Amino acid sequence: TLNLVNGEIPPMRYGGNYKSYGPQYARGIQEGNGKPEDGNLWVTYSMNKEDIWISRIPVPVRTEAGSHAKEDFSRYARLADLTEWNIYSPLWAPVSLETEAGNTWLTLRDKDPFDYAKVERKIPASRQLTVSFDLMAGQNDHGTLQIEFLDADGIACSRIELTSEGILRAKGGSRFSNMMKYEPGKTYHIQAELSVKDRNIRISVDGRPVGQRMFYAPVAS
């Protein structure tokens, strides 16, 4: 199989001669240059002939998920311990583990005008799925957080958003449905129930149903 290390290409920050889109000049640790202490693959590349990236790929390389997610981030001492996650952490949009209000959070920040932080957790293919998690926003007057549910090909069927207007909303079809307002610094327990058979998502916040929306793309699982 051919597996992507990074398949998403950000806009070019600036133009120039002989510049091409996408990851280029990929390099690994060649024979004779030593062996990584962690035994993993380390690959570097240039994105759009601008930023230089370093990717750590856990060995053995796995393409299938063996179990569903049940994470307690307080169990991890550092971000590198989250080997079940795919983490995309630009310099100006870093992903980190931080302590806030007595809890350890997987934290996404962003001040990059051309790129954004991204974390992915692959799970076994499911036609019926219930996902629950705690969420806390650092602000509600700028920035956007998107939570998407994807199939095995990376096609998103549903999306929950925190908008820069302080609204939690869900995308259904070609439209968005506002569900509630959210406040910065407040912890919300979100539960999403997805059904491929019914082609919809039901969302609850702190045990209270806030909306139901149809998938905006057909998926098999």
Name each model feature, range by range.
Residues 169-191:
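Short, aromatic/His-centered strand-loop micro-motif at the edge of beta-sheets
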Residues 100-172:
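Secretory/extracellular carbohydrate-interaction modules
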Residues 23-67:
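Blade-level signature of beta-propeller repeat domains, shared across WD40, Kelch, NHL, RCC1
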Residues 204-220:
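Short, solvent-exposed beta-strand-to-loop segments that form ligand-recognition rims
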Residues 15-16, 117-123, 176-182:
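Beta-strand-rich interaction surfaces with strong enrichment in secreted/lumenal proteins
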